[in-house]
Amino acid sequence: MKSEVSSDAPKRQENLKGVLLNPEAIGASKSFPGEVEMITSKVSNEFSHLCSDTNKQQIDLNSDGTEQEKNLVVHKKRKSQQAGTSYAQSCEVKENQRLLRLQPQSDEDNDSSFSDCISSPSSSSHFGDSDTMTSDEDKDNPRRYSPAGINSTPRTQSARAQKWPRPHTDSVSSLVMKRPCYQVSSLRRPLHRKRFVKNVSSQRTQKQKERIMLQRKKREVLARQKYALLPSSSSSSENDLSSESSSSSSTEGEEDLFVSPGENHQDGTTLPSGGMDEDVVVIEASSTPQVTANEEINVTSTDSEVEIVTVGETYRSRATLGHPRSHWGQNSQSGRTQEHRTRNRVSTIIQPLRQNTTEVVDLTVDEDDPTVVPTTSGRVESQPVSTVSSNTSTSEPASDSVSGLLGSRGCAVSETPAIPPNSNTVGTIADDSRTSTSGTNADGGPPAMPRLPSCCPQHSPCGGSSQNHVLGHPHSSCFQPHSHHFPHHHHHHHHHSSHPGVPLSPSFRDSHCPVERNAAVPPPCGATSGSGSTYHDPQALPVDLSNNGIRNHGSVSFHSTSAFDPCCPGSSSRSTVYGHQSTTSNAQTMAIDGYGSSMVAQAQPQTPSPLSSCRHYMHASYTSLTRPLHHQTSACPHSNPASQPPPPPPPPPMDYVIAHQVPFISPLPSLTSTHAVPPPPPSHHLSTAAAPLPQHLSTSHQSMSHHISATAPATQRLHAHEVIQRMEVQRRRMMQHPTRAHERPPPHPHRMHPNYGHGHHIHVPQTMSSHPRQGPERSAWEIAIETGVTAAPYQTGPLHTHLAHYHPPPRLHHLQIGALPLMVPDMAGYPHIRYISSGLDGRSFRVPFRGNFEELIHLEERLGNVNRGASQGTIERCTYPHKYKKVSTDWFSQRKLHSKQDGEEAPEEDTEEKCTICLSILEEGEDVRRLPCMHLFHQVCVDQWLITNKKCPICRVDIDTQLPTES
């Protein structure tokens, strides 16, 4: 088929041929009847609708009706996707040729085209070609197909025939790059199965198609530039997947991937292309419930070059509602497990459009295991994953990734094959193996390896063994051929042998494949096929990946993003949840992976070098976003090659950005089987890594995961601890850097000085001491403490010297920066203190005062008293104490005489002086003290005053300002 298709689509396929020249992969697929059974059945069903080829493809048709429905959905999706390919026009011609040639082949090509569509953009060495085909075809066909599903089908078939050499490229581009892939699939389906034309309702609008076309063209350019570097690598992978074997297993897997969610869940419900934004780089498996307008993929661009496609929560929700799991369970039990997973997979791809960022983060949510798996450069592996892990969201994501610019990201693709290991069941793994063998092996050939962009093969550390590590299943052998991309898978696979979806190590590519790092973190999550899809490309992470994690609500899938994640590490760590798709063991591994994924994404070198590379890869892009989360060790857990539950490095000190940790929570709970402990970086996948997730995992999840039971508490504890640690780190940082408001030393103690503010002394009533504040402080601080926010003992850091020696009370040790604001109300009456705190961000000044605020207040009072008042020596020195004598007796007598002469009475009061403090008339011989201002007071009265205030009670002149004029 591939040969035929190659001839059919020589100009586009030629490049893809070079890359996708994996007829042997097709052969491998055929040679793996047992493993390709699922795909075969899919193909048979699809082809049965298309042609008599159904019989040969129905070898392993577990449920023809269901398969057919699924295939219909897939075909519809493929049609939609292919419809929107740049092959649109040639697709019609090719479709006719193909129909003449082989309707079955056409169907396969359709699948392949779908795969091509998925992988084309980023996977094919001719990323541009594949992408262009995908974009143009997608755009043209979706438009054409949107109106008429039938037209889209023939065109799709033609496209498939034409694309067959790049079927996987197409399918990848469709999944990854073709935003219209959903409607294309829908449209294609309608041709073969008009009953599914309803999926056309999800078709994109013309405007969306145009947008998608533009984006695809962009990707094409970027992909071509990137693939020029990795021509054979990514193209080969895509093409390998496109190869017939790939087509029947890989492409079909992808198709199934597309179809399964819709069929399984909604029987042909196609992801509404319209729902998805053209900007969406990710193409979701149509199998997931249709992405309605409300579910449309949101594309966030941190950068014009980065597109993050976030599949609407509704869509994801449906995908993750029970169907994904139910189907996952079913899938794991049947050859079609892969298919279902693939179909159930919703692919959200973050596609850095920048050239270097040949990584596309494929945030694929597996309907079964709706996880967001950022699959960067998953397209290379994507097809194999589609094939191998066709049911794994990675398959789709991988395809998407492939469609994304990252053909070179073969790594991510490689991670996708890891997903097939689904390890839903050995059968599933076999299926994956088969798929991988047929699809991945198709990719497996040198070209297939390029699927993981060239760096994938270069990053052989994750190579073949990674598959073995991951699955120790047929996958291993099957994946080994793709050791280059498997290296990325390697971590995922070995993380959770059963985590077929452990995204290939692509995430880990960091060390191995500079370009492949996109999938690095996600792979851990990729443990589950769904997880694979949710990997966040660190590079893509700059885009908002947090939704992916949420997107994965259906599964344990961590919040894959965020992130993307950003911190992302967050996204990577969120990937950890992906493990849910795999069996308990898988989930366990995956949990660790997931944990590592997000957290480890940053903890690059956890276990295997591939993992390390992947982790590092994640780290590379994420490092800035998220400081090594100390999840890195956590990441290792899933990265542990052979042992899925290999004790991951002890949970690293969580030095990650707080933002990343949040996402760990959502998807995990939804999946019971998913054992992937969420992102926590616990050393063992679940023991440590599950720490955050366990909070969300049901007890069953916890018990299922190796250490989940312990992890859940640990996760909660870790989560709180991480938060606390982060807060503490931030606080320390701020404190260590006095320039930061928070870190500033206590509000310049000199302000606290009694004389600060020109003698506006702050008399701090006892009420102002910590006791009155303890209630509020305790409420905030202790709440934080009780929640586990036990910040490290308060560090004085560069506290003011005056404050440094004060050791905060144990209760205040945990006072977080945010807790102190409660003190402000107590200080309301003290403008001084409030002023001090105001400059410090309101809460900053508290940091310095943290535990010692009360002591500081007391100290201030003591200092204030001493400083404000005058010592007895000063009083004696600056004042004139003496015995009071009536003065001016002569003057008074003279005045009295004068008054008498005038007939006036001289008031006697004039002759009397009063002490204004006690208001008593000064009597002769009393001890009086004359201040420098010449005011006279009783010594006893004025001394008491001066002890507290050195200023004259009458004129407020400081006794130190001038020496007494009288001796």
Curated annotation (Swiss-Prot):
Class of enzymatic activity (EC top level): transferase
Motif (SUMO interaction motif 2 (SIM)): 305-311
Location(s) in or outside the cell: Nucleus; Cytoplasm; Nucleus, PML body
UniProt biased composition (Polar residues): 149-160, 629-642
Zinc finger (RING-type): 915-956
Annotated GO CC locations: cytoplasm; nucleus; PML body
InterPro entries referenced in this protein's UniProt entry, alphabetically: RNF111_N, Znf_RING, Znf_RING/FYVE/PHD, ZNRF3_Arkadia_E3_ligases
Biased composition (Basic residues): 482-498
Protein family: Belongs to the Arkadia family.
Binding partners and assembly: Monomer.
Function recorded in the entry: E3 ubiquitin-protein ligase required for mesoderm patterning during embryonic development. Acts as an enhancer of the transcriptional responses of the smad2/smad3 effectors, which are activated downstream of BMP. Acts by mediating ubiquitination and degradation of SMAD inhibitors such as smad7, inducing their proteasomal degradation and thereby enhancing the transcriptional activity of TGF-beta and BMP. Specifically binds polysumoylated chains via SUMO interaction motifs (SIMs) and mediates ubiquitination of sumoylated substrates.
Protein name: E3 ubiquitin-protein ligase arkadia-C
Species for this entry: Xenopus laevis (African clawed frog)
Gene giving rise to this polypeptide: rnf111-c
